[in-house]
């Protein structure tokens, strides 16, 4: 890490980011049609209202929308066993992220015969035997699927999964026996509708355990309206972790431990950002907090690469392909341009002979953060006292309270399946 000696973590009280969210305002199922969701537009402290079907009306031509194309995996696996008393005991394994041996995530999803993941286990005390076994059928072939506990650290387990078929992938296994992991505040089992509607229409990169929900509103018709206006569409990947639902339990945000997530950015997008960021009338619009955190993280990873070069060191170490929770603030004294930072990353990728930046980010965007790449954010309405709400406060200041009060008073639906908003930034 590159520490700034004058850096102090923000000590904002999380209580200042609380509001009353009645259960009746939470969306427990999606709107009938994706683009029917309501859209609140915030620009220079003025609130406007529309629907996602008309979102192109609020975005200028030649703007760039950047989407997260991560796909939610069926990460919940149930093992059921009937004991001698004829009582069914259920053990649920919730796959969080693959162990280091099986990263990037694509490698874990395409693994054959064996793979290991960091997992949560529901009913862990019921797990008495060494190995859990489940039978399944894929392509008319009977397969035995095994789960074995390897280790436990801080309430999470390392689970080794294995199966007795040489060509079936872990992705195929999950598609048959796994369940879509709905957010914890949706207190129901996932159904057939969720398999479609808790995915964006453009999701292709398997690995998330929660949907990048800002994109759920974008239907084919919405994409067509964006294209008609020459609004450019680009894609990156952040695999959303279960930590996205973790409330900030500490009294002040500096005491919160931000979760880390994998990001993947193609070299073509880095080239594009280098040439098209900071240009008047060509704003960069992040679709979702995950896209925003990824884009901003790419800038700071470029800063780290530049600092490394200034020290005349040959290669950026592997552990520096991770952005720590507060590193963006520690590095803020370095005022490199977008072109400089993107060039540094391009040089790094070219030196490695790779077409994709794969890294981890813990970036925590809070009030006081200076946005480097993004000009606007499209996002849903977030939980009280959450790190996602802190991002809204970083954009709007105390105006978030006015925005959320307006949404509550005007029957907007909140959280993952709810309505959304478009925030324009004027504090760059």
Regions found by a protein language model. Give the residues of each.
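Surface-exposed, charge/polar-rich loops and edge strands
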Residues: 2-428
């Amino acid at each position: 890490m590159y520490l700034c000696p004058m850096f102090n973590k923000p000590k904002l009280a999380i209580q200042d980011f609380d509001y009353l969210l009645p259960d009746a305002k939470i969306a427990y199922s999606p709107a009938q049609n994706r683009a029917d969701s309501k859209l609140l537009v915030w620009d220079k402290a003025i609130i406007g209202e529309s629907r996602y079907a008309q979102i192109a009306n609020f975005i200028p031509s030649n703007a760039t929308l950047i989407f997260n194309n991560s796909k939610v995996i069926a990460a919940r696996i149930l093992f059921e066993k009937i004991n001698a008393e004829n009582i069914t005991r259920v053990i649920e394994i919730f796959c969080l992220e693959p162990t280091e041996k099986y990263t990037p995530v694509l490698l874990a999803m395409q693994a054959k015969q064996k793979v290991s993941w960091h997992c949560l286990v529901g009913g862990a005390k019921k797990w008495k035997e060494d190995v859990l076994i489940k039978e399944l059928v894929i392509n008319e072939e009977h397969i035995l699927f095994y789960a074995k506990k390897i280790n436990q650290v801080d309430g999470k387990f390392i689970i080794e999964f294995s199966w007795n078929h040489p060509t079936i992938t872990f992705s195929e296994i999950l598609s048959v026996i796994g369940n879509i992991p709905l957010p914890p505040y949706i207190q129901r089992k996932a159904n057939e509708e969720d398999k479609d509607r808790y995915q964006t229409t453009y999701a292709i990169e398997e690995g998330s355990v929660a949907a990048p929900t800002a994109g759920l509103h974008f239907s084919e018709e919405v994409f067509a309206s964006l294209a008609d206006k020459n609004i450019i569409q680009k894609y990156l990947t952040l695999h959303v972790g279960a930590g996205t639902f973790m409330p900030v339990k500490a009294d002040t945000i500096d005491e919160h431990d931000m979760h880390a997530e994998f990001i993947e950015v193609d070299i073509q997008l880095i080239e594009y950002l280098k040439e098209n960021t900071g240009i008047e009338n060509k704003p960069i619009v992040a679709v979702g907090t995950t896209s925003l955190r990824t884009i901003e993280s790419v800038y700071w990873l470029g800063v780290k690469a530049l600092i490394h070069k200034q020290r005349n060191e040959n290669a950026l170490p592997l552990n520096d392909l991770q952005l720590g929770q507060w590193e963006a603030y520690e590095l803020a004294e370095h005022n490199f341009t977008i072109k400089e930072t993107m060039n540094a990353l391009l040089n790094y990728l070219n030196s490695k002979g790779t077409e994709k930046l794969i890294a981890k980010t813990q970036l925590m965007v809070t009030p006081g953060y200076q946005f480097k790449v993004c000009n606007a954010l499209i996002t849903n309405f977030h939980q009280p006292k959450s790190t996602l709400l802190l991002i809204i406060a970083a954009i709007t200041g105390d105006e978030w309270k006015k925005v959320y009060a307006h949404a509550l008073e005007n029957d907007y639906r909140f959280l993952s399946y709810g309505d959304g908003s478009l925030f324009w930034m004027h504090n760059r």
